């Protein structure tokens, strides 16, 4: 039995055309060029459950691929996973077609990227939110606790009840990492604030259950929560809708989700999976690439949709904390390193 090159999670979420090969449905982001040489030069991206238009994690990755396409004028290949079995099938089929790099979006794809990268050592691969320790793989990981700290501060400063909420997707170390950073930030801004947290579930289905997200949000609001952080993939759409319906505030994640409910979304903790995909498409650099506030891999979203919700005083405090985290003056505990939030 070979030794796995996949490290534990640092973090970790449509329609395509029918193919006779293994029943998979394939979509090319642009018309495929007949020349084999050109086809072999094409990069490929495999989106995780929820699809490239999930308005969250996958969609940010899609935007990175589209940015590369627009800048280079070149096409890329894509596939949207519908079930677990398709992850390795998609990666292997792309590799067989000569695609390079093949980029897996999300930690659930790590084992498939590892297996296929071993079998195609002369091609390049990339994985987001996991470490695959192979010489032809670039692993992108994020310091999500840093960005979560900032939105935690904003939640505490915006709260009138002194109670802020967190609804996570799948209960895994990655989501606990978000929660831990959020709680630290909230208590940094207001030591007396109460943080009420819920997890949607323990299986990947927790990322795509807006109805359950809405239920958990309503339960928190019944306890007095008036700001809730939705760190739950597509499930977050239900969380944010429930907050809006109750006249409360929500915080988006991964993509800038402020526009989904203008005047109700306090901010979004933007995680630049778009940057990771864009950089991988430009050229894989094997090894680990860590992205945080300093590298521009994370940030809070400010735009016309939430400008009236964030006072100049609040923004000033948050920007000061951001600068202190970047300089190292302010340390934020990483749950996945400490295995605790303390």
Model-predicted segments: where are they?
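Bacterial N-terminal signal peptides that target proteins for export
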Residues: 4-30
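Enrichment for repetitive, rod-forming helical segments
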Residues: 9-10, 29-33, 94, 279
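A residue-level marker of the well-folded mature domains of exported/periplasmic proteins
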Residues: 40-342
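N-terminal signal peptide c-region/cleavage motif recognized by signal peptidases
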Residues: 34-38
């Amino acid at each position: 039995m070979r030794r796995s090159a996949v490290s534990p999670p640092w973090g970790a979420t449509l329609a395509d055309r029918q193919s006779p090969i293994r029943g998979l449905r394939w979509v090319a982001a642009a018309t495929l060029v007949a020349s084999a040489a050109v086809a072999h030069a094409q990069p490929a991206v495999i989106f995780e459950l929820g699809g490239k238009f999930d308005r969250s994690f996958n969609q940010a990755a899609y935007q990175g691929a589209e940015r590369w396409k627009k800048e280079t004028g070149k096409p890329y290949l894509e596939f949207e996973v519908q079930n677990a079995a398709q992850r390795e099938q998609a990666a292997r089929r792309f590799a067989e077609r000569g695609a390079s790099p093949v980029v897996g979006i999300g930690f659930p794809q790590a084992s498939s990227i590892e297996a296929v990268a071993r079998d195609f050592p002369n091609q390049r691969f990339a994985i987001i939110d996991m470490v695959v320790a192979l010489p032809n793989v670039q692993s992108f990981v994020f310091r999500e606790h840093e960005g979560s700290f900032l939105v935690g501060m904003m939640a505490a400063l915006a709260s009138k009840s002194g109670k802020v909420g967190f609804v996570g997707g799948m209960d895994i170390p990655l989501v606990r990492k978000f929660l831990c950073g959020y709680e630290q930030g909230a208590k940094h801004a207001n030591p007396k604030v109460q943080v009420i947290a819920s997890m949607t579930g323990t299986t990947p289905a927790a990322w795509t259950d807006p109805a359950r997200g809405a239920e958990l949000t309503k339960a928190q609001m019944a306890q007095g929560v008036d700001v809730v952080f939705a760190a739950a993939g597509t499930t977050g759409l239900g969380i944010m809708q429930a907050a809006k319906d109750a006249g409360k505030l929500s915080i988006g994640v991964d993509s800038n989700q402020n526009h989904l409910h203008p005047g109700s979304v306090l901010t979004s903790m933007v995680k630049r999976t778009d940057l990771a995909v864009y950089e991988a498409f430009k050229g894989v650099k094997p090894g680990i690439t860590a992205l945080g506030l300093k590298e521009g891999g994370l940030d809070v979203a400010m735009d016309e949709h939430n400008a009236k919700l964030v006072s100049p005083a609040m923004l000033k405090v948050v920007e000061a904390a951001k600068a202190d985290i970047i300089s190292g003056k302010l340390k934020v505990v990483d749950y996945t390193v400490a295995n605790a939030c303390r």
